[in-house]
């Protein structure tokens, strides 16, 4: 497998950064994909598009994870996305903290800000509807709180969602958060972590994510995701911590 490596000179702007894309497959019809900077630009992108009956019935169940870090009173967001709001296109430009992107059959992102850095590795389990996301978190001279906001969905991979179509029964058990779609109560989406604390969010929908390539194809390119919980992880000063995430059906 050839290794492709890129650095900040390759995404001087948001629009440049979404021109290069990656994809990973699981061997049974499921896949993952996004852009080099982590912003989705196509309806068919996400961290886990599962094949409900291999190799067909492909559904987006796990779109992505947005990350923030809080150091003292300062919070930095690493979210990289494009949305439509109040008739305008708005950008979350977390790629400004992205220092490297590597594709070697799986995906590696590295981010850095004052007093904190982290690496993020995304891959799929072969012959299973399982996405693994591994983090390595490094704090500088101050204690940090690293917060993950997972974005979930349940839609056919070429469609789009609205808040009205994203309804779930949810519950937490041990270190896992479960979502059962109202549209299909025969499956459960499981989001499992090696550590951290789940907390409920006041805003539970990510509304009108705008997918630029779909816009270029003369559609509205809008999608919605369900994000009912945050996962918070404490990182003490001058330490490195590894955290593992599994999302599966």
Language-model segment annotations:
Residues 1-249:
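Terminal accessory carbohydrate-recognition/targeting modules of carbohydrate-active enzymes
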């Amino acid at each position: 497998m050839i290794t492709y490596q890129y650095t900040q000179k390759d995404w001087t702007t948001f629009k440049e950064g979404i021109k290069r894309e990656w994809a990973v497959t699981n061997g049974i019809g499921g896949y993952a994909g996004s852009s080099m900077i982590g912003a989705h630009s196509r309806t068919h992108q996400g961290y886990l598009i599962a094949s409900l009956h291999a190799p067909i019935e492909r559904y987006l169940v796990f779109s992505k994870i947005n990350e923030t870090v809080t150091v003292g009173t300062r919070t930095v967001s690493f979210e990289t996305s494009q949305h439509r709001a109040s008739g305008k296109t708005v950008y979350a430009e977390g790629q400004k903290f992205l220092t490297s992107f590597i594709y070697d059959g799986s995906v590696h992102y590295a981010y850095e800000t004052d007093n904190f850095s982290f690496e993020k590795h995304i891959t799929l389990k072969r012959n299973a509807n399982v996405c693994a996301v591994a983090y390595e978190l490094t704090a500088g001279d101050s204690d940090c709180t690293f917060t993950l906001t997972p974005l979930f969905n349940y839609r056919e991979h070429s469609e789009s969602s609205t808040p009205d179509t994203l309804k779930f029964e949810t519950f937490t058990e041990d270190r896992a958060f479960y979502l059962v779609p109202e549209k299909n109560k025969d499956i459960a989406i499981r989001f499992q972590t090696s550590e951290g604390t789940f907390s409920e969010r006041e805003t539970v929908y990510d509304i009108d994510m705008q997918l630029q390539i779909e816009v270029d194809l003369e559609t509205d390119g809008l999608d919605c995701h369900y994000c009912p919980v945050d996962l918070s992880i404490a990182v003490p000063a001058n330490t490195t911590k590894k955290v593992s995430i599994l999302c599966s059906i």
